[in-house]
């Protein structure tokens, strides 16, 4: 397992190119699994279920077709994006379990900062109850699987400019807002969040099994 960390924002095309190359190498057993933690410059991405009507400010930032599941989301500085390239041939061919584990990864990491992240039936991602029936989204998930190799992953709001989410209907859900660690009073650094994510990953996913691959 390789952990990669980007010190400066990574362009979206560069990230896509890296993932395409890496998952091909994982499939051919020429590279190991990888988690890449990074930030992007401000941009919007459209998943395969995105409704064009949900792009409210099309000229605000660059918009990219992501190829992942889900709808529109915002990426930008202060948001920790995790691209998770795992070999499900070795880990059990269960995409639902993989998505559930990504949610658990964020829930555990948030708990280290005394934030209670929660799942919601029918709404992939992580939510925080704010009282009075209000709840805001703090973590998003959008994945793709090719030949049982995962790519894309999750985005956790640490200290992004939350106003930038107003240019879209985030994940197609207009009834709820977005929040971040800083918005909730937890002024964690990205490096502190990275450490929490790594610990949570080890607890949730564990090491990659070493048994031989089955044909696909």
From Swiss-Prot:
Cellular compartments annotated: Cytoplasm
Keywords: Acyltransferase, Cytoplasm, Transferase
Domain BPL/LPL catalytic span(s) in chain numbering: 29-209
Binding site for substrate: 68-75, 140-142, 153-155
SUPFAM superfamilies in UniProt: Class II aaRS and biotin synthetases
Enzyme class, spelled out: transferase
Pathway entry: Protein modification; protein lipoylation via endogenous pathway; protein N(6)-(lipoyl)lysine from octanoyl-[acyl-carrier-protein]: step 1/2
Active site, per annotation: 171
GO cellular component: cytoplasm
Residues at the site labelled Lowers pKa of active site Cys: 137
UniProt record similarity statement: Belongs to the LipB family.
Note from the entry: In the reaction, the free carboxyl group of octanoic acid is attached via an amide linkage to the epsilon-amino group of a specific lysine residue of lipoyl domains of lipoate-dependent enzymes.
Protein name per Swiss-Prot or TrEMBL: Octanoyltransferase
Origin species: Rhodospirillum rubrum (strain ATCC 11170 / ATH 1.1.1 / DSM 467 / LMG 4362 / NCIMB 8255 / S1)
């Amino acid at each position: 397992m390789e952990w990669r960390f980007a010190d400066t924002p990574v362009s979206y095309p560069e990230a896509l190119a890296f993932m395409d190359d890496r998952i091909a190498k994982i499939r051919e057993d020429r590279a190991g699994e990888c988690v890449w933690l990074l930030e992007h410059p401000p941009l919007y991405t459209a998943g395969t279920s995105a409704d064009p009507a949900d792009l409210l400010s099309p000229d605000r930032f660059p918009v990219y077709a992501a190829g992942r599941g889900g709808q529109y989301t915002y990426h930008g500085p202060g948001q920790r994006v995790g691209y998770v390239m795992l070999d499900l041939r070795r880990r059990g061919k269960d995409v639902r379990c993989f998505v559930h584990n990504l949610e658990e990864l964020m829930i555990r990491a948030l708990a280290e900062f005394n934030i209670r992240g929660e799942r919601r039936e029918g709404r992939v991602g992580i939510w925080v109850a704010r009282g009075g029936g209000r709840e805001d989204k703090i973590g998003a998930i959008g994945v793709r699987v090719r030949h049982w190799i995962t790519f894309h992953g999750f985005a956790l709001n640490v200290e992004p400019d939350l106003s930038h989410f107003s240019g879209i209907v985030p994940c197609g859900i207009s009834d709820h807002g977005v929040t971040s660690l800083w918005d909730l009073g937890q002024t964690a650094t990205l490096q502190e969040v990275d450490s929490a994510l790594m610990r949570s990953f080890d607890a949730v996913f564990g090491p990659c099994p070493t048994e031989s691959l089955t044909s696909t």
